[in-house]
Amino acid sequence: MAKLIMVQGTSSNVGKSILVTALCRIFKQDGYKVAPYKSQNMALNAFVTKEGGEIGRAQAVQAEACGIEPSVDMNPILMKPEADSRSQIIVNGKVDRTISAREYYEYAPLLLDTALAALNRLREKNDIVVIEGAGSPAEINLKQREIVNMRIAKEASAPVLLAGDIDRGGVFASLIGTIDLLEPDERYYIKGYLINKFRGDASLLKPAIDVLEDRTSIPVLGIIPYLRNMAIAQEDSVYLDECKGNLGETDLDIAVIRLPRISNYDDFDALATDGASVRFVSKTAEIGNPDLIIIPGTKSTIPDMEYLEQSGLAETIIKKARKGTHVLGVCGGYQILGKMIYDPHKTESETTELKGLGLLDTETTFEKEKATTQISGQVKFDSGLLSGLAGCAVSGYEIHMGRTRLFSAQPAFHITKTPKGPADYLDGASNAEGTVLGTYIHGIFENAAFRRGFLNAIRRHKGIPERQADYFDRDKEYDKLADIVRASIDMEKIYAILNEGIR
């Protein structure tokens, strides 16, 4: 059975996911067969495994850092918020039910056996499993029924590293406060602290670290610097507030609409590696005059279309599109580009039909069954945003409940393969000029040749030189992350904790 180590945090967005990614890569570099695990994840960023199951995007990234194929066992329970108090519950990769927060509070303990069974399957196949917690283990209002922090640590006998974010301030208070709110038997599982996102001279922290260690009898095992320009997907939407927009010199300006229920926003990270500045905007005044407007995926298409209307963003997008600004919609954003959206089963809300932006001659109807599959195929259309790309290979994954019908709009992609075998269907749509494009393919910009051709089509339209981008190697990014974190933490002590386990 695999040995275990767990990363918990004092709150959300302290960097648990990226630290787990780093540890996964470090253990892989050291020759171990390693896998990530998070029993329960609440996220709108999702990934589809080869089996067609949904998991959190963070666990897919962590699996990539491990050099293994993502599986539903890495995230057996995924919660996808649909409204402020309701979530769609994904269990072992498949939709289980949609329930309120209060209902889930009662339901969650029933899923503990499912979560532990997934962890045990991972332990049977690997040398090490790195477990990620959620939020904080000191959320005392949730403690009795949580199945993602101390409950998992205790059930699995997993030693815990507690991470805190020093960049936001108050890290020592948050670490000590977390320990104080844990029960005595829970504190026993905390074997070390990781102070994350530090800027400056680490030696200046020594007096505070001495107090922390004296008061809690738990050692600080690392001070990790604030990571900049890392082309690795981030899980928390707080990342959008911190997003700097590019990784080097840029010649294209891309504005991504920050929908209230935005999902899979990391679809566009790769664009920033090829000379584009990627900005997330939520107000009409922030749009400016971009070369491309992107309407991203959303868990709730109809409510987010209503938001676009109420905020004035819809009018602005339509006006700019009519003046020639390129517009791309992905998944829910693709549905929004059409003329009508129908929801006869009230899948998303009580609204059964709503007008879209009308930039594509399409209509979307929501069905009861969700499509979740990896795909591969090629570009079919050859104009505008897809100019010169006909026949270019693409791959990615689909997660949607809508079925989109094309009228005068032109199909954009031909899907030829899924994990089940050969396929033959069309995806996406473009207007005749190719200036407005929609697709259901998540991860499409991970395809380097397509990404480069897509951006160069915009450059040609803009009248600026095309770029022959450098080959982007995400594997090197994982190594870069691992090297920085390895140099910042006491791996000798972490290996000792891993080997000793909980006794």
Curated annotation (Swiss-Prot):
GO terms for molecular function: ABC-type vitamin B12 transporter activity; catalytic activity. The active site is at 331 (nucleophile), 442. Gene3D superfamilies: 3.40.50.880, P-loop containing nucleotide triphosphate hydrolases (3.40.50.300). GO terms for biological process: cobalamin biosynthetic process. The keyword Amino-acid biosynthesis does not apply. Keywords: Cobalamin biosynthesis, Glutamine amidotransferase. Pathway: Cofactor biosynthesis; adenosylcobalamin biosynthesis. InterPro entries: Class_I_gatase-like (IPR029062), CobQ/CobB/MinD/ParA_Nub-bd_dom (IPR002586), CobQ_GATase1 (IPR033949), CobQ_N (IPR047045), CobQ_synth (IPR004459), GATase_3 (IPR011698), P-loop_NTPase (IPR027417). It comes from the Bacteria. Residues 251-450 form the GATase cobBQ-type domain. Belongs to the CobB/CobQ family. CobQ subfamily. Catalyzes amidations at positions B, D, E, and G on adenosylcobyrinic A,C-diamide. NH(2) groups are provided by glutamine, and one molecule of ATP is hydrogenolyzed for each amidation. This is Cobyric acid synthase. It comes from Dehalococcoides mccartyi (strain ATCC BAA-2100 / JCM 16839 / KCTC 5957 / BAV1).
